[in-house]
Every structure is written in C-alpha cells, then in structure tokens.
Regions:
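Short, conserved beta-strand edge motifs with alternating hydrophobic and charged residues
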Residues: 172, 209-210, 233-236
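Thiamine diphosphate
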Residues: 1-172, 176-177
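Glycine-/acidic-rich phosphate or pyrophosphate-binding loops and their flanking alpha/beta elements
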Residues: 10-17, 157-168, 177-228
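Short helix-loop-beta junction
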Residues: 43-51, 137-141, 217-235
Length: 236
C-alpha cells in the first residue's frame, strides 16, 4: 500500500478485511456510522456490508454486549463497539462474569470469542465520566485479553488478530491517536497469543514502558531527555 493511513483509517481497513473474509462476522453497538462517536473508523461499513451485519442499536450497553457474547458461544464472530468505554461498565456482567469465565468453567471446550471495542473518547466537550482509560482494571480479569495499539499498523493488525482469537478480547483505541499517520503493508495475520511487547527505541540510561497514547507522549519526552544527554529505551 503506497499511501499513508490515519490511525482511524487503519481500523477501518481492519474492519473491511474482516467483513470481506469472514461472512459470519457482525458488528453491533451505538453510533456505528457517526463521526462524532467513532471518527472515520467505521465510515460506510453499513453501505458496503449491509445493516444486517453493521447493527446500530439504541443505548443499552448490557443488551448489545450480552448479545455479542452469546453469539460467540454458538460459533459466530462478533464485535461490540462501546464509543465511550466509561459506559461499558453497564456491561460488566456479560464481559467479566460470562465471556471471561466460560472457557475456564468448561475445560476449554467452548469460549466466547467476542471482541469488545472500547474507545477512549476524552477531550473537547467530554466530562470526567467520558474520559477514562480503564485498561488496567480489565487486565486483571483472568480469561480476558486486553489490546491497546499505539501505532497505525497495530491498530489494523491487532484488530484482526483480536477477532480471529479464540479468546474474548478487549480492544482499546484512543481517539487522540486518530491523527497519527503511517504506511500500511499488506495484511499479515498475527496470532494474538504470540504477540510480545515491541522495543521501539534502544537506550542505555533509563527504560520507559508505555502503551497506547502514552507511547506517543513517551517519544516526545525522550526527545527532550536526549537533548539533556539521557539515553532512553522505549518499550511499547
């Protein structure tokens, strides 16, 4: 691919790849074609793939999440979108008590391979109840994988890997990253369970460990420290 993509456009490319190649996949949630909710990350998906597969719902986080979790238990692939992860707390039961537990309760014979997209939607007119990043909470839940891509490439490729994983996955994207741009190679299918932290920069004085938007902030901090003669290692 010989053009640059924005972070949100890379997510859109991931959705297009998945919906084109996996006919049993559907997406459900609120504001799925509203730029105010999801930027350009889902632009025209309803026109390309139909509203039977791109299902925009009334406001009921528990209902649409429970539906997606249940569909995963009967072999379907589903993505449920929460435009503000703060309100995903209304869906704690299907995520934490059902999706995350199912494989362990039944000896690994069945699992809800639902992907839960949670958007960090802070800034602008957003209040404190709209601006949280709750990734560390969910990272403590056994059976639930948590993904927070910081790069354009990872935004696409880790979305695809999340949906193709056998486990329930919480995929978190930060809207403050949407303006980042980079080139995309052809899709390479990754196995989510094999992904490791990325060494972004080598350094000899201090190590900085970051994820998502904090990786971008860390790069800026490293440039300042570099001018002071401090060499930093950055792990994403």
């Amino acid at each position: 691919m010989n053009k640059k993509y924005r972070y949100d456009e890379a997510i859109l490319e991931g959705f297009k790849f998945l919906l084109s190649n996996y006919s049993d996949l559907f997406i459900i949630g609120q504001g799925l074609w509203s730029p105010w909710y999801v930027g350009n990350s889902m632009k025209d998906l309803d026109k390309l793939f139909g509203k039977e597969r791109i299902i925009d719902t009334p406001v009921s986080e528990a209902a649409c999440t429970g539906l997606a979790v249940g569909s995963g238990l009967v072999g379907m692939k589903s993505i449920v979108v929460h435009p503000r992860m703060d309100f995903m707390l209304y869906a704690i039961d299907p995520i934490v008590n059902q999706a995350a537990k199912w494989s362990h309760m039944f000896g690994g014979k069945n699992s809800s391979n639902v992907t839960i997209r949670a958007i960090i939607n802070r800034g602008g007119e957003q209040g404190a109840q709209h601006s949280q990043s709750l990734h560390s909470w969910f990272a403590h839940i056994p059976g639930l994988r948590v993904v927070m891509p910081s790069s354009v490439k990872d935004a696409r490729d880790l979305l695809i890997a999340s949906v193709l994983s056998d486990d329930p996955v919480l995929y978190i994207d930060d809207r403050w990253l949407y303006s980042q741009e980079d080139y995309l190679n052809e899709v390479e299918i990754l196995k989510l369970s094999e992904q490791k932290p990325n060494l972004i920069m080598k350094g000899s004085d201090i190590t900085i460990v970051a994820n998502s938007y904090s990786t971008l902030l860390s790069k800026k901090a490293i440039e300042i420290l570099k001018r002071k003669g401090i060499s930093c290692e950055l792990i994403d």
